Amino acid sequence: MRYAGAALLVAVVCAIPTFGQSAGQPEWTTSSYNPQRDAWQRHEETITPQNVAGLKLLWKLKTDNKTMGMQSFREPLIVSGIGTPAGAKTLAIVAGSSNEVFAIDVASGELVWKKPLKWSSQQPQEAGEGRGFICTNALSATPVITPAGAKERTFYVLTTDGYLHMLDPGTGEERQAPVQMLSSVYGKAYGLNLVNGVVFTITGQGCGGVANALYAYNTATKKVSVSSPPQGGLWGVAGPAIGTDGTIYFESGDHPYDAKAGLLSASVQAYTFANDTLTLKDYYTPSNYEWLNKRDLDLNTTPVVIPYQGRDVIVGGGKEGRFFLLDSKSIGGADHETPLFRSELLANANVNFQTEGTWGSFAAWKDRGGVQWVLAPNGGPTTLKFPINYGATPNGGILAFKLEEKNGKPVLSQAWQSGDMMTAEPPVVANGLVFVLAGGEFTGQTNDVEGGLFSAEERIKRSIPAKLFVLDAQTGKELYSSGNQIASFLHQAGLSVAGGRVIFGSFDGTIYCFGIK
């Protein structure tokens, strides 16, 4: 199975803060915590390495969310001090696959409001669940909310009709009429990012006939901008990552390559955004891009941006099983093929385009000693044992690296690998701990016995219940496991951590909250 893909990188004029967080209660306002997509909750104090063994299931809420293919929920957003008819509350706001949004009182687990979002397109709504497990007609982009301290908190969510909705987070009511952001219905968009009043997203896999591109909606001018020419699939689950200088980064999958025509498959691209126009600035293409395209080894992740020695360093990777570092000042060098660092092959010796290598997004954090860490989910076994490991990992797990200097150049040094996990989702770091869901999803695509592709129904039947793990961030040692408390698997659902609470949704429509009582 081949997916088209390319990757883009966009520069916004103003510098972007490394994170937007209130001075009061911790929040989680966007996919992977902040615009840089580092998934590092800097303000967690309640859950500690000393008490995490006492983590409990505080509540679970069974919703009536209708699944679409393998899709159910997106990553929850957690926001505090939100005015509701019942007073100020901390809410977990979760978008469901069928264009419904659920707001839950984090303290009690009670539903505060539910908002079914109306179909806005003139194109007809389909009755089914799309085709296969790829284009499932599902809401697929994690929403975003304006950060704490903003004059007005607004919850942005992109529905399957291609329209961007702007909701009051306290009531779910529309603040204004929805805006058409995508050219057609059922495009497959990923994690919304919001900086300087501009909402960005990317689309992938050609679903609904929507051009695979970078999209921007300027809330000040009310205009939508689209990068050109259309690329292959852009499908990092956390959407675009935005650097501290305003550059927007994302990766690509396979597609015909023609640099002169602007068709940059298996690449990272740079665009500037000014006056509601997106313009190509720079790009990086691995020197073995032809082989990556031939073997369907997409660059399929959302990269993470790390401020480092006076510039941003971008960490990327994908199915191939290698990781690379890019310099924001020149992401591919003069020939567009020279990264700061490219690792040896660390995974996917089987050249497996379905279940191995890295998928989703990364995490990055700095410990009290100033050591910069990078974490990545990985499918399948590694090609070598990391210095700290916990046995064989036939299904995969989490890989941890240190960003260090060697011979005057930055490198990623292997540090630890977790125990075995069935489909490790992107990790989250908080207070010296790594929170990760072993999603339990069966990720096979081609049915080698009967031929053709597995259907979504067949993949669902082969999946197993998810597990929540908490690891020591320095060593990868398991400090907590949820065991059999989660009844279903999850697909790209993601977890959020804030204020001593770990919240996520599963395929069967249940939203879970673990925490310290």
Please provide the spans of the model-predicted regions.
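N-terminal secretory signal peptides that target proteins for export/translocation
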Residues: 1-2
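Bacterial N-terminal signal peptides
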Residues: 5-17
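Short, surface-exposed beta-edge/turn micro-motifs
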Residues: 10, 89-91
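Blade/loop signatures of beta-propeller domains
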Residues: 22-58, 77
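Extracytoplasmic/lumenal domain signature
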Residues: 45-70, 83-88, 99-137, 145-186, ...
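General structural concept
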Residues: 74-80, 92-94, 102
